[in-house]
């Protein structure tokens, strides 16, 4: 008489004990976490939605809200995103509404121009590249010509996962050279501001420009090494 075969089945995995914070999480555990990047440096989608409602109360047509925000952020790229910035011109869809009037709505919902612009930084980056028109102040920052599109103060938002992603993605990502040039210009400006009331500058700071940091003819690797050294010095001067 044949012996009936017995099949062995693998035991079902025990449910993970998620009450124990000291238990090492598995990759499957981590996949269950639906995290969205947030930072106080970037306005939130909810804040942008509230801002849109305020724009409509000013008389902006509902279908013009998003383009008005893109235009506003692009205008800030020319003058820098600060409370003291003075915006000229009107919103494209309604000549009766000035950009300055739209910008005043930031303070109603307690966000800064920089937070607003950081949210739209990737949109602005695409606008700059698509039009082939760099920020108006790029030359004043001392940026080399091949880094001119990085010449706006909320450029780092282009690299932030908390910023709004264009539907088609970036036209191109920023180059390492553009990232380094922006960083050098940023810390150079902070250092000079800190020393504005001083009678003398450190010798290396007197002669340091973004051009001297990234434009001296040399190999790409040496470019980055020189930039990193100069940027480190600037951070020390700024107390950063």
From Swiss-Prot:
Molecular function GO labels: structural molecule activity
Keyword Transferase: no
Function per UniProt: Required for genome encapsidation. Forms ribonucleoprotein complexes along with TGB1 helicase and viral RNA.
Lineage: Viruses, Riboviria, Orthornavirae, Kitrinoviricota, Alsuviricetes
Protein localization: Virion
Predominant subcellular localization, coarse grouping: virion
Any one GO CC term of the record: helical viral capsid
Protein name: Coat protein
Positions of region (Disordered): 1-27
UniProt keyword annotations, A-Z: Capsid protein, Helical capsid protein, Ribonucleoprotein, Virion
Compositionally biased residues, Polar residues: 1-10
Superkingdom classification of source: Viruses
Family: Belongs to the potexvirus capsid protein family.
């Amino acid at each position: 008489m044949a012996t009936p075969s017995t099949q062995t089945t693998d035991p079902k995995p025990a449910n993970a004990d998620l009450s124990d914070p000291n238990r090492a999480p598995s990759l499957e555990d981590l996949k269950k976490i639906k995290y969205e990047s947030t930072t106080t440096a970037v306005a939130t989608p909810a804040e942008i939605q509230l801002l849109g409602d305020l724009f409509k109360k000013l008389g902006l047509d509902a279908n013009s809200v998003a383009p008005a925000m893109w235009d506003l952020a692009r205008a800030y790229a020319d003058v820098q995103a600060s409370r003291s910035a003075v915006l000229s011109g009107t919103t494209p869809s309604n000549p009766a509404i000035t950009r300055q009037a739209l910008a005043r709505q930031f303070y109603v919902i307690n966000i800064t121009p920089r937070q607003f612009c950081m949210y739209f930084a990737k949109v602005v980056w695409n606008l700059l590249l698509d039009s082939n028109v760099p920020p108006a102040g790029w030359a004043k920052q001392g940026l080399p010509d091949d880094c001119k599109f990085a010449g706006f103060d909320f450029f780092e938002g282009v690299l932030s996962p908390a910023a709004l992603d264009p539907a088609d993605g970036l036209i191109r990502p920023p180059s390492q050279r553009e990232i380094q040039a922006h960083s050098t210009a940023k810390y150079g400006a902070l250092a000079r501001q800190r020393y504005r009331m001083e009678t003398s500058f450190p010798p290396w700071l007197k002669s340091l420009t973004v051009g001297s940091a990234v434009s001296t003819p040399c190999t790409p690797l040496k470019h980055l090494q020189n930039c990193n050294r100069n940027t480190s010095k600037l951070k020390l001067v700024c107390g950063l």
